[in-house]
Amino acid sequence: MTSATQSEAVRLDVTVDVPVEHAFRVFTEQFGEIKPREHNLLGAEEVVETVVETRVGGHIYDRGESGTVCRWARVLVFEPPRRFVISWDISPTWQLETDPSRASEVEVSFVAETSDRTRVELEHRHLERHGEGWESVRDGVADPGGWPLYLQRYVEAIG
């Protein structure tokens, strides 16, 4: 896995030995296996599932034990098997952000290197939209427990 952090964006990539269609499907349809359950905004309530609604206008949300739903991202672009883009509706204080103009974006692109090998490129951008404290978002998602952990778990989910 390679990574780069700049003031405006966090970029990471990983290569997996599967066709691009499979790589895309695992990332979007098995995201609940990729996202650690302890990464949640439900407070003390445990997350029982994380769901990606695989369409533009859909959400990524966590469902808690009581059925409570926390929608923490909006699906902005969904172009199987090439890419998808989501909003990051989480503020610098790690609370839900309700103002779309103060949300950053995460783009995940899937590039076929061969018929059985895919490079997955993740870019978390427009972090400055979060306003004061945006650097804490950048540092948090770039931390080994942020997007690098998600990509590691993604590789494990690929098998």
Regions found by a protein language model. Give the residues of each.
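Hydrophobic/aromatic beta-strand elements that line small-molecule binding cavities or substrate pockets
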Residues: 14, 72-77, 103-112
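Glycine-rich portal/gate segments that line the openings of hydrophobic small-molecule binding cavities
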Residues: 45-94
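Hydrophobic pocket/interface hotspot
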Residues: 23-27, 60, 75, 86, ...
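Hydrophobic ligand-binding cavity/cleft-lining segments
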Residues: 1-47
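Structured surface interface patches that mediate subunit assembly and partner/cofactor docking
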Residues: 6, 41-44, 125-130, 143-149, ...
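Solvent-exposed alpha-helix faces
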Residues: 28-32, 80, 152
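Beta-strand/loop substructures that line and gate deep hydrophobic ligand-binding cavities in soluble
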Residues: 94-145
